[in-house]
Curated annotation (Swiss-Prot):
GO MF terms, alphabetically ordered: DNA binding; DNA-binding transcription factor activity
Gene (UniProt): PHR1
Source species of the chain: Oryza sativa subsp. indica
Keyword tRNA-binding set for record: no
Region described as Disordered: 1-32, 168-219, 345-428
Name of the protein: Protein PHOSPHATE STARVATION RESPONSE 1
């Protein structure tokens, strides 16, 4: 929004001036019967951001020393505090002042807004003689009507801008943008207004905003309402395929809008995906733990298998040793059994054949040699066989002596004893 100060409108520039003007005075030559049209640019810019309030001194000529000027000054004081006050009363007062001046007076005031800040003050006074008062009254009334229309145009066009701006903002904008005044002149000329007292109403928020705010009111989701919502979502194929419009149609709840369903559906989706993510993390943690446990278990199993193989090897070695020992024991048992059988046979033969002693005597040395060899092999049986052999020899000698006393006796060592000695032995 550009704020600029209006300049003299075209309607005022085109007003025909009277040819009977006596003199046109400069600001330094202002007489007593003329009216200054512009008094202070700074005061007018403070009171209104776009158009200055016209101040005129009619007190000396027209007799309005107290009422009109005081009312204008009081309105100016109120403009500083409250810039949003209606200015219809000022417009009516200015119109009445212009009408009074044209009917009974000597001068015709030309109204135009104040120039931009920094421009030199100027005034333009046109004096009209008494005899031309009636002829110029029509031009003055038309001029006043155009002025009123121009003032109403300013109020109608810029009233919203005045409501939005503050007093300080208006001062800064009017001082900073004097060059935009020429560009804003066509906008004032194009607008038309019939009544100067019309004021634009204060803007209020559109009804659409109120409806939107009413539709976006918070709603408490009860467990029953949430269950119906979940049921509708499941009917539509899950939270991904469900749409707020379809859920709203299926729920059929009074006071429930599509905004409520949309927000609740978004929350439902996020709340549903969060446990899945947490479950995925827990599953990943479980898999890592299981892998570590599997590695540990496999290592333990390999170690146990290795120990088991070592134990089995040792057992096999021990079994081989035991088998070899058993074979040796069996061989020794067989050998001992053979020796025992031979001893039994020799003893039975000596007992059953006593008459074969003579024949057995020459074979005794051979038997004794065999027995000596067996005793060498088995020393445990030496003591057992020796007494048996001695008894057998003694018995053989007695039988031989009884049977043949005259036969020479053969000693055990193979030497023959003399006969005398045998007799002595026999007698004794």
């Amino acid at each position: 929004m550009s704020s600029s100060l209006p300049i003299l409108p075209k309607s005022l520039k085109d007003i025909p001036r009277s040819h009977n003007t006596q003199n046109i005075l400069m600001p330094g030559q202002l007489p007593n019967d003329s009216m200054p049209l512009h008094q202070s640019a700074t005061q007018s810019s403070i009171s209104h951001p776009r158009a200055s309030v016209v101040r005129s001194s009619y007190s000396a000529m027209l007799g309005y020393a107290a009422n009109p000027i005081d009312s204008v000054s009081s309105h100016e004081g109120h403009f500083m505090a409250a810039p949003f006050i209606s200015q219809s009363s000022n417009a009516e007062m200015l119109q009445s002042l212009c009408n009074n001046n044209t009917h009974g007076g000597h001068t015709v005031p030309t109204f135009f807004p104040a120039p931009a800040c920094g421009a030199p003050d100027y005034m333009d006074t046109i004096t009209v003689p008494d005899n031309h008062t009636q002829s110029g009254s029509s031009t003055v009334t038309s001029d006043a009507a155009k002025q009123n229309e121009w003032w109403a145009d300013i109020m109608n066009d810029d009233w919203k801008d005045i409501l939005d701006a503050t007093a300080t903002d208006s001062q800064s904008k009017s001082m900073a943008q004097p060059s935009n005044s020429a560009a804003s002149q066509p906008a004032f000329n194009q607008s038309t207004s019939s009544h100067s007292g019309d004021i634009c109403p204060v803007t209020s928020p559109p009804p659409n905003n109120s409806n939107a705010s009413a539709s976006k009111q918070r709603m408490r989701w009860t467990p029953e309402l949430h269950e119906s919502f979940v049921h509708a979502v499941n009917k539509l194929g899950g939270s991904e395929k469900a749409t707020p419009k379809g859920v709203l149609k299926l729920m059929k709840v009074d006071g429930l809008t599509i905004y409520h369903v949309k927000s609740h559906l978004q929350k439902y989706r996020t709340a549903r995906y969060k446990p899945d993510l947490s479950e995925g993390k827990t599953q990943e943690g479980k898999t890592t733990d299981e892998l570590s446990l599997d590695l540990k278990a496999s290592m333990d199993l390999t170690e146990a298998l290795r120990l088991q193989m070592e134990v089995q090897k040792r057992l096999h070695e021990q079994l081989e040793i035991q088998r070899k020992l058993q074979l040796r024991i069996e061989e020794q048992g067989k050998y001992l059994q053979k020796m025992f059988e031979k001893q039994c046979k020799s003893s039975t033969q000596s007992v059953q054949d006593p008459s074969s002693g003579d024949t057995a005597t020459p074979s005794e040395p051979s038997n004794s040699v065999d027995k000596d060899s067996e005793a060498a092999l088995d020393p445990n049986r030496i003591g057992d066989n020796h007494p048996k052999n001695s008894t057998n020899v003694g018995a053989n000698l007695k039988t031989a002596a009884t049977e043949s006393p005259d036969s020479p006796v053969i000693a055990t060592d193979g030497s023959e004893l003399p006969q005398e000695k045998r007799r002595r032995v026999h007698e004794s």
